[in-house]
Amino acid sequence: MADYLVIVESPAKAKTIGKYLGKKYTVKASMGHVRDLPKSQMGVDIEDEYSPRYITIRGKGPVLKELKSAAKKVKRVYLAADPDREGEAIAWHLAHSLDIDETSECRVVFNEITKQAIKDAFKSPRPINMDLVDAQQARRVLDRLVGYNISPLLWKKVKKGLSAGRVQSVAVKMIIDREKEIQAFEPEEYWSIQGTFALDGEPFEAKFYGTNGKKVELKSEDDVNNVLAKLKGDQFHVDSVQKKERKRNPVSPFTTSSLQQEAARKLNFRAKKTMMLAQQLYEGIDLGKEGTVGLITYMRTDSTRISDTAKAETKEYIESKFGKEYAQNGTKAVKKDKKSQDAHEAIRPTSVERDPKSLKEYLSRDQLRLYKLIWERLVASQMAPAIMDTMTVDLSNEGVLFRATGSKVKFPGFMKVYIEGNDEGKKEEDRLLPNLQEGQTVTKEEIEPSQHFTQPPPRYTEARLVKTMEELGIGRPSTYAPTLDTIQKRGYVALDERRFVPTELGEIVLELMTEFFPEILDVEFTAKMEDDLDSIEEGKQQWIKIIDDFYKGFEERLKVAEEEMKEVEIKDEPTGEMCEKCGHEMVYKMGRYGKFMACSNFPDCRNTKPIVKEIGVKCPKCEKGEIVERKSKKRRVFYGCNQYPECDFVSWDKPIARSCPKCSSYLVEKRTKKQVQVQCSSCDYKEEAN
């Protein structure tokens, strides 16, 4: 019979840890939180210093019964939930439910699930950290005070099922503010002049820079013509050649935020999916003869540091695989963000020796892709900087200056393993110039002016929104993914081509929130609240005072809102179409994900239809219907025939009104981030989109 009981959150984690601890230990899972505030009432006693009234979560009774029974049979119980606020709170609730003294050495924490980390953790158990618990409790109580008071108000004044929260409301505001910027944007005209030149028949490109040594902006076609009129002949003089060596340093290992951003950019993963896969890699994967192994460190962190052991192992790996010149020389200082809690390491593989190829047969495709990203990022972070040779050349003709820039990799360093992605999806390539020297003459081959217009700021992608939230101090590693998930589930925003757009419902709710609860939407207020929660965790402030300072002002605004907030009637709009089932008029209604079409004879007729957008292309299958843009249940855009179900044509890619010149099948637009290519739906024909 076992002497010790270890309680973790999940069966996967229990299985991995159980393998390392041996027969004297029984490892069981609590399946997450066992106690929480009740759903049916506020659960916070405002008169009794905001005391939370916790109850056993529905369905957790049998779990607690099993844990209590197991606890009675052992000498000692260890609580080994995750090493953060949420994990500390789970441990505290378990201690309360199992009558364990929270001041006893019952808490065990580890940053990775490996044999050595588990052994070390069990050598130094500690009491439950009540500062961590209080920080989690303060967040929970704050969110309950806001949500439980404002949500019913929104149900009453707008529609049922709505909710309001501190962080989610600010995220919605950011998306709506960006949409307003886009709508208010007035494009400005500007021009550029691209020149193709040649030295001894070797072509290269340069851009117009200015005149008489000064930079000049081209605002109109007249400006362009004035510049071109100055040029005489095809010969340009090489005025200057500047050659420099530039170092490019590797990026740090992943934090939660940077992992979500990079997985979105490189793998097209949503934040929620990234965290689900990371959790699986952290809790343990069955590696055959090796058994179940935790492959990465804890995935909720805002730290970029790694342990000395991990540094040494990674350096040794780099030297053996790439050579000593590729290993980082000296210790790179880790810049600590003032918002970083830094309680953990960065996200890294638990062993750099487990390269992605060695795990291919044990991981799913998406698990492997995410692991590869994490592994490459760690290795690259400990490698030498890349060294680039850069060259800047100025060419002139009658005082008209063109500038050419080139670069090539002299020493790849970390770039041999990993290059960070960017939101535009552009690939970095060498830009090579001929071996130009001052005083030489080059020949102009072509001059091509181009008209451009300034572009509005882009809508937020998940990656960009997470990055901006992090920069502003809104939310913490554990809250980014749930926040993005919630604002979509509530129907306040939707994703259009992987970018957030506000819904009419989101705009209505934000307008009410702005009028009656402006402080909840204030970025600085929300960021300060996060800092206050951090200070509670550090033992510098009492959680009750933080809550009280917030609630005094909030309570006053709540009273005003209850009296003055007017009901918002979201009226049905006529569509001009008749219901094909009963003959009544179809109307536009507001639903969870925005507008849809429904019969005005509801509830007698329950006919509903999505709002579809014709794209001006005949159906290539039945040749009778029109192709329309639709959205799947997961909000992904696809294209189908408007004669469905008679015609079942469907395509994820947008068909265009041309046939393939090679096989006569229909052509589609294939989108990859910002690149659009025309491809055949049947054969290998491709062409660049105009």
From Swiss-Prot:
Gene3D superfamilies named among the record's database cross-references: 3.40.50.140, Bacterial Topoisomerase I, domain 1, Topoisomerase I, domain 2, Topoisomerase I, domain 3, Topoisomerase I, domain 4
Biased composition (Basic and acidic residues): 339-354
Stretches assigned to the Topo IA-type catalytic domain: 129-558
Function: Releases the supercoiling and torsional tension of DNA, which is introduced during the DNA replication and transcription, by transiently cleaving and rejoining one strand of the DNA duplex. Introduces a single-strand break via transesterification at a target site in duplex DNA. The scissile phosphodiester is attacked by the catalytic tyrosine of the enzyme, resulting in the formation of a DNA-(5'-phosphotyrosyl)-enzyme intermediate and the expulsion of a 3'-OH DNA strand. The free DNA strand then undergoes passage around the unbroken strand, thus removing DNA supercoils.
Catalytic residues (UniProt): 298
Keyword terms: DNA-binding, Isomerase, Magnesium, Metal-binding, Repeat, Topoisomerase, Zinc, Zinc-finger
Family label: Belongs to the type IA topoisomerase family.
Top-level taxonomic group: Bacteria
Family matches, as Pfam families: Topoisom_bac, Toprim, Zn_ribbon_Top1
C4-type Zn finger ranges: 579-605, 619-647, 660-683
Top-level taxonomy: Bacteria, Bacillati, Bacillota, Bacilli, Bacillales
Gene Ontology terms describing biological process: DNA topological change
Organism from which the protein derives: Halalkalibacterium halodurans (strain ATCC BAA-125 / DSM 18197 / FERM 7344 / JCM 9153 / C-125)
Annotated InterPro entries: Topo_IA (IPR000380), Topo_IA_2 (IPR003601), Topo_IA_AS (IPR023406), Topo_IA_cen (IPR013497), Topo_IA_cen_sub1 (IPR013824), Topo_IA_cen_sub2 (IPR013825), Topo_IA_cen_sub3 (IPR013826), Topo_IA_core_domain (IPR023405)
Cross-referenced PANTHER family: DNA TOPOISOMERASE, DNA TOPOISOMERASE, TYPE IA, CORE
E.C. number(s) listed in UniProt: 5.6.2.1
Location of the Toprim domain: 3-121
Chain positions of site Interaction with DNA: 33, 139-140, 143, 148, 155, 300, 490
Residues holding Mg(2+): 9, 82
Self-association and partners: Monomer.
Chain spans, region Interaction with DNA: 163-168
GO molecular-function terms, A-Z: DNA binding; DNA topoisomerase type I (single strand cut, ATP-independent) activity; zinc ion binding
UniProt GO cellular component terms: chromosome
Catalytic reaction equation(s): ATP-independent breakage of single-stranded DNA, followed by passage and rejoining
Cofactor dependency: Mg(2+)
Region ranges (Disordered): 329-354
Record protein name field: DNA topoisomerase 1
